[in-house]
Design a protein with these regions (language model features):
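Hydrophobic pocket-lining "lid/loop/helix" segments that shape and contact the acyl-thioester
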Residues: 157, 161, 165, 172-183, ...
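Beta-strand segments within the central parallel beta-sheet cores of soluble alpha/beta enzyme folds
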Residues: 6, 45-52, 79-81, 108-113, ...
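N-terminal extracellular/periplasmic Venus flytrap/periplasmic-binding protein-like
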Residues: 11-12, 22-32, 40, 173-265
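Conserved active-site "lid/cap" helical segment
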Residues: 1-59, 63-71, 78, 162-171, ...
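Active-site pocket-shaping loop/turn-to-helix segments
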Residues: 12-38, 55-57, 80-94, 106, ...
Length: 330
């Protein structure tokens, strides 16, 4: 089977909620990332575009195809949109890996995109008409993104609270993790660590002034001195706060994946190779610890041990997620 490599990797800056990037749709942001990744790779065509998105309501048909067109790709290139919640972009990369590994594709654009700022409100039961009484308005972001589908109205952050309680992660420990993460982000911005992976975005601010955005928005606006005093976000006496949870954000990211044989034949850059991937599922309310078992499954498939890996990148949806993963010495 084919060896799969990463040819290029580009993302937009990450915008805050109703912040610098709220004038762009998710497909706009995805298109920018795809365009940047293709330019970085030095190509003008791929076999297919695969993009993940969670909040698709109001986006119009086939958001991935819209992103493909926004990137200037030809209309003969297929595009696939998928939704796997927070793992949507990663799943797009996994599917792309499988297609190339099996020889079904030679080169693909894969990634994820989201504009939480533009998530619409929904009007249930309006299709048949509201005959009498008050109607109801539902927040698409909450209903389809931040709330549990099996316990309607229950925010996913309450499951983070359950995790903190089970593993005795204190408020102080979570805040310390959040502060360290913020410190790392600001340090990376200052030293321009992410400069080569961020595609600058041209926009016009609310005062009509043209701006070029090159930095992630939220770390710059954070006020670390206030973090210890923030109120819990999900339970009155809880430990999970807005600071030790992830931000509501906008952005897009894309990879160009190809087979090693194709990359070498076409003289394309090879930045890394992908060996394999794994998925793991358990009860939805236990999502905070699912990465532990996905990692163990992955290591077993490679006959590796955790100490053979130099760097782990873990989704920080809540501080308790990487903190839980550290329990297996990662």
């Amino acid at each position: 089977m084919e060896e799969v490599v990463i040819t290029s990797a580009i993302r937009t800056p990450i915008g805050g909620f109703q912040g610098e990037l709220d004038c762009f749709s998710a497909s706009d942001l995805g298109g920018m990332a795809i365009d940047g990744a293709m330019k970085q790779a030095g190509i003008d065509r791929v076999d297919e575009v695969i993009m993940g998105i969670v909040l698709g309501a109001g986006q119009g048909q086939a958001p991935a195809r819209q992103a493909s067109f926004a990137a200037g790709l030809d209309e003969t290139i297929p595009a696939t949109t998928l939704n796997k919640m927070c793992g949507s972009g990663m799943k797009a990369a996994m599917i792309g890996f499988d297609q190339i590994k099996l020889g079904q594709s030679k080169i693909l654009a894969v990634g994820g995109m989201e504009s939480m700022s533009n998530a619409p409100y929904l009007l249930p039961k309006m299709r048949g008409g509201a005959r009498l009484g008050h109607g109801k308005v539902i927040d698409h972001m909450f209903h389809d993104g931040l709330e549990d589908a099996y316990e309607p109205g229950r925010l996913m952050g309450t499951f983070a609270e359950d995790c903190a309680e089970k593993y005795q992660f204190t408020r102080e420990a979570q805040d310390e993790y959040a502060l360290k993460s913020l410190e790392n982000s600001l340090s990376a911005q200052k030293s321009k660590v992410f400069e080569n992976e961020i595609m600058p975005i041209e926009t016009v601010d609310r005062k009509g002034k043209k701006r070029t955005i090159v930095l992630d928005e939220q770390p710059q606006n954070a006020q670390p001195e206030k973090i210890p005093n923030l109120k819990p976000a999900f339970r009155k006496d809880g430990t999970v706060t807005p600071a030790n949870s992830s931000s509501i954000s906008d952005g897009g990211a894309a990879l160009i994946l190809s087979s090693r044989v194709y990359s070498e034949k076409m003289g394309l850059p090879i930045r890394a190779r992908i060996l394999t991937h794994s998925s793991y599922a358990q009860a939805p309310g236990l999502f905070t610890t699912a990465p532990i078992y996905a990692v163990q499954k992955l290591l077993k498939s490679l006959s590796w041990t955790a100490d053979m890996v130099d760097l782990w990148e873990v989704n920080e949806a809540f501080a308790v997620v990487p903190m839980a993963l550290s329990l297996i010495h990662i």
